[in-house]
Amino acid sequence: MTQQPAIEAAPPLLHLSGLYKSFGTNEILRGIDLEVHAGETVAIIGPSGTGKSTLLRCVNWLEKPSAGEVMLDGVRLRAEMTGKEEQQAIRALRSRVGMVFQQYNLWPHFSVLRNVTEGQVRVLGTDPGEAKAKAREFLARVRMEDFEDRYPSQLSGGQQQRVAIARTLAMGPRLVLFDEVTSALDPELVGEVLETMKQLADDGLTMLVVTHEMGFARRVADRVVFMNGGHIAEQGPAEVVFENPVHDRTRAFFDHVRRSSWTV
């Protein structure tokens, strides 16, 4: 876990202001204000259907907010933007943020190495030799360096997800969004992905993580954000939120999680 006082000495890398998102008459996000500092790992937790994944998708404009503003590393996007101005800002923002999804979305007909090099070459214009070197560097960081010639069908779900993480890192994002990346994995494979994410957090990668893995949120996150009903109900240092939650809804959530936990 990184040191919170040092992180907060600098301006935030990500600033969300007054984010709202509705689908028709269904209001999903209701005025989200949030900051994430460089080097910080922030875990977003809460009941299903409370807007956590929608919030991540608004950060990189996969879903356009109904109102509000996203500012990332000096790039500002406002919900009222349209046309060329909006498209230019979207391109600038997406060059600074990466996202790892629940599904791995690897190209099935590409090797592991090519999966990690393809975006570098086609999107960033990186020299193929340089892209391969960088791909091997990030595959090593996620402990997949011995699998570069294999194809996705030859990998376990956990291995595919680690390749997806390497592919995202190779694009050089300032911030990485993780959207419930272990939810599609067999239980025995979850640990290898969480351990990879823990190592990235220890290395200082800036991470905004939606997760149902409460142990990860508690032990790895610098800060925990509890969402309920489209709002941020509570946030603070992980240990404080888990040990001494302020709001009744947060306490009820943790009580339910504890009652629902089964041990073998």
Can you name each region flagged by the protein language model?
Residues M1-Y20, S261-V264:
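ABC-family P-loop ATPase nucleotide-binding domain
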Residues T2, E239-V264:
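C-terminal boundary and immediately downstream tail of ABC-type ATPase nucleotide-binding domains
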Residues P12-L16, Y20-A238:
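ABC family nucleotide-binding domain
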